[in-house]
């Protein structure tokens, strides 16, 4: 009767390494196949739905192609992205040159309204999804710099539109673009176009030398004031108290913004939505962390008050 000789430690290590390599390769292959399939669905959907006239319309997609919500595990991405890097982003030279019908494919260019609400750094789209039904007559845009996260939100919106296509509300007023709001915001929006801007759980950039990359600075606030109409509101929320104090300090010091009261925040429906909708906010709640909110109203330009 023969017996199998025990493997030495080197052979065991080689087998373990080979198994791990095969597992990682399988995961990467699955992720690649999934992304390719989602991209094909995304391109088909946009091409079919963006046709401006019934004569040019293409056949509808089979429901099983788009009705499934995307899975986050196939959209792996770093938590943050350097806003000063060259990301090869596409952006219009002027807002008038932007083709919004590609972002809101159920609207023809003739019927398309202007975007009124912007979620800057929209992440996985939780706030967008909850804001949409509250403002069905307003176009709401998410801006996200990370490519795979943007793709996830696009695929999520495509699936939601298909799932709810027979409902009174079907998420047609929501859109997302990959863009860098710190560089190109005025390329997308005209003066006084927006009524609300949301900054939810932005990158805190803890190191002092990185503070210049924070989404709220004196220079950027002037750009936000340019695209925000008088009486419009800037919403901020974070779980980092130091960042909250930073944002409050800079907004307090800017002449075109005035902080709204705690009573106003308690009554505003957008604050309630912002507090609980984002994936980051839900993670903070699970970890029993604190959330810091500050909302500011856009004041009239000084020249207009004279």
Curated annotation (Swiss-Prot):
Record's protein name: tRNA (guanine-N(7)-)-methyltransferase
NCBIfam families linked: tRNA (guanosine(46)-N7)-methyltransferase TrmB (TIGR00091)
UniProt lineage: Eukaryota, Fungi, Dikarya, Ascomycota, Saccharomycotina
Compositionally biased tracts (Polar residues): 1-19
Catalytic activity: guanosine(46) in tRNA + S-adenosyl-L-methionine = N(7)-methylguanosine(46) in tRNA + S-adenosyl-L-homocysteine
Active site positions: 203
Family according to the record: Belongs to the class I-like SAM-binding methyltransferase superfamily. TrmB family.
Pathway participation: tRNA modification; N(7)-methylguanine-tRNA biosynthesis
This protein's encoding gene: TRM8
GO cellular-component term (any): nucleus
PANTHER family xref list: 3-DEOXY-D-MANNO-OCTULOSONIC-ACID TRANSFERASE/TRNA GUANINE-N 7 - -METHYLTRANSFERASE, TRNA (GUANINE-N(7)-)-METHYLTRANSFERASE
